[in-house]
């Protein structure tokens, strides 16, 4: 079996690597399946929401997740002004709602397409979400075109064992609900 040569300690091999184009990177990322979420907020900055698949757990002590928010998103001002979000994990059948929140649809039309109730932080929770994480934003880090929001989870709303929704290869796919046992 062939072995690859280790990089030297100066990491000079990295400097010789060819640049990866934006298109190559996006094509590769399309092969990384991810849960589809709608991130919502409400408060002094207004009611807003956006579709996100760049969401993941950071730690369970304290429970924290991260959300990547495009700085040019129509929801960016409201999210930062309110300081709270609810990460609603979508179920199979929520594809149209995901598309509304992922496009240029006005906020009032986005929210009119779903049923919502209010979380403890004031952020909207989607009725029928697989699970919703009610959060307060504790830190924001700017990286390129996005803000990475570190969100402390202050509440959960579980919607049961419905099929989840993932985005993979530029298409939606349903995944089985929670296993028993």
Curated annotation (Swiss-Prot):
Protein name in UniProt: FMN reductase (NADH) RutF
Against InterPro entries, the record matches this protein to: Flavin_Rdtase-like_dom, NADH-dep_flavin_reductase, RutF, Split_barrel_FMN-bd
Q: What is its EC number?
A: 1.5.1.42
- Keywords on record: Flavoprotein, FMN, NAD, Oxidoreductase
Q: What class of enzyme is it?
A: oxidoreductase
Q: Which HAMAP family match?
A: RutF
Q: Specify the domain of life of the species encoding this protein.
A: Bacteria
One GO MF annotation is: FMN binding
Protein family membership: Belongs to the non-flavoprotein flavin reductase family. RutF subfamily.
- Write down a Pfam family by its short name: Flavin_Reduct
Write down the chemical reaction(s) this protein catalyses.
FMNH2 + NAD(+) = FMN + NADH + 2 H(+)
Q: What does this protein do?
A: Catalyzes the reduction of FMN to FMNH2 which is used to reduce pyrimidine by RutA via the Rut pathway.
Q: Which Gene3D superfamilies match?
A: Electron Transport, Fmn-binding Protein, Chain A (2.30.110.10)
Q: In Gene Ontology terms, what is a biological process of this protein?
A: uracil catabolic process
């Amino acid at each position: 079996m062939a072995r690859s040569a280790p990089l030297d300690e100066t990491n000079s091999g990295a400097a010789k690597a060819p640049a990866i184009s934006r298109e190559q990177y996006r094509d590769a990322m399309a092969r990384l399946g991810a849960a589809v979420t709608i991130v919502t907020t409400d408060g002094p900055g207004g009611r807003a929401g956006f579709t996100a698949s760049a969401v993941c757990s950071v730690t369970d002590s304290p429970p924290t997740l991260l959300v990547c928010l495009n700085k040019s998103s129509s929801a960016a001002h409201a999210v930062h002004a309110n300081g709270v979000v609810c990460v609603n994990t979508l179920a199979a059948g929520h594809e149209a709602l995901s598309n509304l929140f992922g496009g240029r649809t006005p906020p009032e039309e986005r929210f009119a397409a779903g049923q919502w109730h209010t979380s403890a932080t004031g952020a909207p929770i989607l009725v029928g979400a697989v699970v919703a994480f009610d959060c307060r934003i504790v830190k924001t880090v700017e990286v390129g075109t996005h803000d990475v929001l570190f969100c402390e989870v202050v509440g959960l709303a579980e919607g049961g064992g419905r099929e989840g929704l993932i985005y993979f290869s530029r298409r939606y796919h349903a995944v089985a609900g929670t296993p028993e046992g």
